[in-house]
Amino acid sequence: MVSAVAQAIVVSDLTKSYGDVAALRGISFAVAEGEVFGLLGPNGAGKTTAVEILEGYRRRDGGAATVLGLDPGTAPRELRERIGVVLQQSELSPLLTVGETHRMFAGYYANPRDVDEVIELVGLTEKRDARVKSLSGGQKRRLDLGVALVGSPELVFLDEPTTGFDPAARRAAWELIRSLRSLGTTIFLTTHYLDEAQQLADRVAVLRDGLIIRQGSPADLIGDTRTTEIRYVRDGQTVVVATNEPTRALSELTNDALASGHELEKLEVRRPSLEDVYLELVGEETE
């Protein structure tokens, strides 16, 4: 359990309804300072509502929430001085350059980061003088992140940070997020990419129908929920063995194959993933 002094976010029995529809039905979790925390769930689960409450953009109906020791419902302006937000879609001026955009946002903060340092951190040094409208989709997301970081935030909210990225750009973004974590920045991540959450998050919470149905480290969730699968082909048929003891099962299979003179064709040992766990918890997601 994380000690109280080490918590960047504390949420207890948080509720929010829109008319007769309950978006959040008493969720509780804590985020430690300096960790990457992932909030996962299908569309309509309540993720956006929860994040907007924590950012100070939406009022809760009940329960308690503190972010960096502040109540986001009563101290939103003070809170926004200390957090950075990367929205899924942003509206930055297309006619400003990358450098001008960073300098403009730096002017909103009392103690901003050095603009050139931020531009280098997000990998846009060569695009410093390029206009926003000329940037690729991945470069615009890097600009969004730079704008979120220029105020020296203690906590950064990342909403679908790599949507639309090609594989190389996604990996580069992951390394950037890891570098932020190494600097002590707390990161609150929402993503539909389960491999991204597994790679980056120290802990995750799975939200469904306004309730948190599971939370913990990705390794803990995987260990609690899934077994390892061993697949091979024998006599033209695919055989799948599910086991909690893969070493023992594989040894028995190979010994049997050696004794009978059979080959374990197309042998594959498939470890469970966070995506497997997620789909078991919430089912197939539909858009």
Language model: regions and residue ranges:
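Actinobacteria-biased recognition of intrinsically disordered, low-complexity terminal regions
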Residues: M1-V5
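ABC transporter nucleotide-binding domains
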Residues: A6-V11, K16-L189, L194-R208, R214
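Short, charged/polar low-complexity linear motifs in solvent-exposed/disordered segments
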Residues: G41-N43, G84-V85, L92-S93, A219-D220, ...
